[in-house]
Amino acid sequence: MQTLSIDLETYSDQPLAKTGVYRYVESPDFEILLFAYSVDGAPVQQIDLACGEKIPSEILCALEDDKVTKWAFNANFERICLSRFLGYPTGDYLEPDSWKCSMVWAAYMGLPLSLEGAGAVLGLEKQKLAEGKDLIKYFCQPCAPTKSNGQRTRNLPKHSPDKWLAFKKYNIRDVETEMSIQARLLKYPVPDSVWEEYHLDQEINDRGIRVDMQMVENAIDVDGWSRFDLKTQLQDLTALENPNSVAQLKAWLTE
């Protein structure tokens, strides 16, 4: 095995766009739902983890094998998610040196930084499936409890087998599209120096920054005291119940 192309579908109660992948995977509710992969460009295989299937041992070994190059579109997401799945402690992750990101390749070529956008510009035969956004919202995020859904806060495969089947197809197609991007750009390789920069970037992000938590906690306390003091002064000055209210403050200013 020389290369492993990967795409994951995951669940977490943390909003990925707001928290970033590191906080996202630290949630106790985080889990990998679907694992689609291709070994050395072979037809895509899929592991339905949500329904009890297991990742083959040779694939698990390949994830930690520096001799196997792992590919994904926005590979940082797959690498960090799989680190959590493999039981790495918080702050420790799969080494980035054996990972390459086709989004970086797309960026190097001036293409859109999305799988859908890059595929469209390149005119790929197998485009990213458009219905994916709705399926991700359905299966990958908490849902609002309602009478019609039995007050549940999460949608599982059993709640909509048809949608789950479509979601599995979407997951497989993402790997196919990612591999097609690689094939189309094969004549325009990313220089080794750029991959070195990418790996350094990943190490920096994995390491994070040191934070003086005592200073942070004190700053929060000072902010609370300051807000209370300023609000009290404004109440004394204006006699308003809530001087933070724009409507009340406008009315006071016009008196």
Give the residues covered by each predicted segment:
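Conserved "right-hand" nucleotidyltransferase catalytic core of DNA-directed polymerases
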Residues: 1-10, 14-16, 34, 134-255
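Ser/Thr-glycine-rich phosphate-binding loops at phosphate-binding pockets of nucleotides
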Residues: 8-14, 23-25, 74
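Cytochrome P450 core scaffold surrounding the K-helix E-X-X-R motif
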Residues: 13-17, 46-49
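A short alpha/beta connector and helix-capping loop motif
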Residues: 15-36
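Active-site-proximal helix-loop-helix substrate-binding element of RNase H-like nuclease domains
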Residues: 30-37, 41-186
